[in-house]
Regions:
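Short coil/turn segments at secondary-structure boundaries
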Residues: 12-18
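A short, polar/acidic, helix/strand-boundary loop motif
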Residues: 41-68, 72, 90-96, 104
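A glycine-rich phosphate-binding loop feature that marks nucleotide/adenosyl-phosphate handling sites
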Residues: 18-21, 86-94
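Amphipathic alpha-helical
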Residues: 1-12, 117-118, 123
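Acidic, metal-ligating active-site segments
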Residues: 28-37
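Metal-dependent nuclease catalytic cores in nucleic-acid-processing enzymes
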Residues: 63-83, 107-118
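Two-metal-ion RNase H-like nuclease active-site motif
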Residues: 18-27, 70
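Amphipathic alpha-helical blocks
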Residues: 27-28, 111
Length: 123
């Protein structure tokens, strides 16, 4: 245990043009995302973000909270989103929700914002 605690994991730099993976998570009070790269079969953390909900954001439906986590990551990690293909890994049908013709309001605006990046979705 002492050895593990005395050697914290290091953040790994990304390589130009490589595919990066984004894990998004939602709780009752916050959203978070971890941007990782695959290096020889092991994943290395590049960046981690989290953001607490403010005001009415707590009342978003679960799928909107997940989309909010993705757009928050895109805002904070814009240089990575511009330079790399981002593969979003989630257990929810986020791609279908973002590209649905019934998507209105925030979801439609976020989908338009994300369309400028090379984002792929994998469940």
């Amino acid at each position: 245990m002492k050895k593990y605690l005395s050697s914290p994991p290091l953040l790994s730099p990304s390589m130009p043009g490589e595919e990066l993976y984004l894990y998004v998570a939602v709780s009752q009070a916050a959203v978070s995302a971890a941007l990782v790269r695959d290096k020889g079969g092991s994943q290395r953390l590049i960046y981690f973000i989290s953001r607490a909900f403010r005001g009415a954001e707590e009342n978003y439906p679960r799928m909107e909270k997940l989309a909010f986590a993705l757009i928050t990551a895109a805002w904070k990690l814009k240089p990575y989103f511009q330079a790399h293909t981002i593969v979003v890994l989630t257990d929810q049908p986020l791609k279908r929700a973002m590209s649905s013709p019934e998507a209105a309001g925030r979801m439609a605006l976020w989908a338009i914002e994300l369309s400028e990046f090379d984002v792929q979705y994998h469940s």
